A protein has these predicted regions:
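Juxtamembrane intracellular "pre-TM" segments in multi-pass secondary transporters
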Residues: 3-11, 196-225
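Cytoplasmic helix-loop-helix junction between adjacent transmembrane helices
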Residues: 110-148
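C-terminal transmembrane helical hairpin of 12-TM major facilitator-type secondary transporters
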Residues: 284-333
Length: 409
């Protein structure tokens, strides 16, 4: 059986559609990271504790886990153009509502709303790419759009406190409202450029029972394995993104130095996302996955044995290479599983992100628990290395399962 990439003709205007998806994902990153640099101001203004603020910051992820699968089903039935626009509206409404929050519960509800819009964007983006790109172009397109959240997060972190807070008279609510309107603008841009999206495999008819579609996706053994692998990938990515500064500080770096060093894997990750996914075609995909998981493994081990020594920069580079492309290549593999394709990419993407966010929440929590028990990060880094090793081992059965489906070449 030939891969889907050999069956679909390139679609005119696909790069404009990719630009629209990137804008949506960038707005996703803006609003996802928008609270972090404003936490001290919000806590002081609303009179809430660190513990309460922690529940606010995690509210959208909790909702996201349960909303991702229904959102994926909506994507396949509604179509990407309308569904992604609704995602942008929900994210924009979340940002604007945060800006008007006057107490803890209002802020909590506003942030939770992001968990309803976010899955439409994150599950819809790979569906748009699978509908419009083929072969190496598909990998490149996925690598490009996946940089959007990182760019949005960096813009939020770099501009909120140094530029926007002084410019807006120290009113943190106006900053959050600005990010909300950025999401609405991205939604309008997508509505303009997203016209004409087609699905050559045919849409799922609204009359088709939902459980049939869910069962059809989960009945595929490669999909089930990829969902398990997604938990491991998000455990590593979210653990490192949330704890890296503290890990470096624990190893002896000052807070300013640790913050600067933490930029290294972020920059390397962008380069990785723009280069490696386009190589992950056909049977080469498995070699790329093993390489990425190996980079994560050796990065964690170098942190363990090297600390702030001469191996530090190599460890940061390896973690950046892995973090920039692991998720992208895994999603690329998912949407090309026979029985998924463009037709069920939204549903499969919903399952992917629902499962993955279990690791996204659990990874950082596990690191915090291990640190609290030992007073250091050695056991936590050993756990991340073990997860990477398990991911390497999972590539072999994944290749065998896909070969049985006629995908491996």
């Amino acid at each position: 059986m030939q891969g889907l990439s050999t069956q679909i003709e390139p679609i005119p205007g696909r790069w404009w559609k990719l630009a629209g998806v990137w804008a949506l994902y960038m707005a996703f990153g803006l609003n996802m990271a928008g609270l972090a640099p404003l936490v001290p101001d919000i806590e002081a203004d609303l009179g809430i504790s660190h513990a309460s603020m922690g529940t606010v910051l995690g509210a959208w992820q909790f909702i996201y886990i349960f909303a991702a699968i229904p959102c994926g089903l909506v994507l396949d039935r509604m179509g990407t153009r309308r569904a992604l626009f609704w995602g942008a509206l929900l994210i924009g409404a979340s940002g604007i509502a945060r800006g008007f929050a006057q107490e803890y519960l209002h802020l909590l509800a506003a942030v939770a709303l992001f968990g309803l819009g976010g899955p439409l964007i994150s599950a819809g983006a790979p569906k748009v790419v699978s509908e419009n790109f083929t072969g190496a172009e598909r990998g490149l397109a996925m690598g490009i759009y996946i940089t959007g959240p990182g760019v949005g997060a960096m813009v939020s972190l770099l501009f909120s406190q140094p530029v926007l807070m002084p410019l807006l008279g120290g009113r943190w609510g106006l900053v959050l409202i600005l990010w909300g309107f950025a999401a609405l603008a991205a939604g309008l841009f997508w509505l303009l450029v997203g016209r004409g999206v087609t699905r050559s495999a045919g849409p799922i008819t609204p009359s088709a029972p939902l459980w049939n579609e869910i069962g059809a996706v989960l009945s595929l053994a490669p999909v089930r394995l990829i969902l398990l692998m997604s938990i491991g990938v998000f455990s590593i990515n979210h653990a490192m993104s949330n704890w890296l500064v503290e890990v470096l500080h624990n190893f002896g770096a000052g807070l300013k130095q640790a913050s600067l060093l933490a930029v290294v894997p972020a920059v390397v990750g962008i380069v990785s996302a723009l280069t490696l996914p386009r190589l992950a075609t056909g049977s080469r995909r498995f070699g790329v996955l093993i390489t990425l998981f190996s980079c994560s493994l050796f990065g964690s081990l170098l942190f363990l044995i090297g600390g702030m020594g001469s191996w530090l920069y190599l460890a940061l580079i390896l973690m950046g290479i892995a973090g920039g492309s692991m998720m992208t290549v895994l999603i690329l593999t998912l949407v090309e599983v026979p029985g998924v394709g463009e037709r069920r990419a939204g549903t499969a993407g919903g399952f992917f992100f629902s499962a993955a966010e279990i690791g996204g929440v659990g990874g950082p929590v596990a690191i915090g628990v291990l640190y609290g028990g030992s007073g250091g990060f050695s056991s936590a880094l050993a756990l991340l290395a073990l997860v990477a090793l398990l991911l390497i081992g999972a590539v072999v059965p994944l290749r065998r399962l896909l070969a049985g489906s006629g995908k491996a070449q």
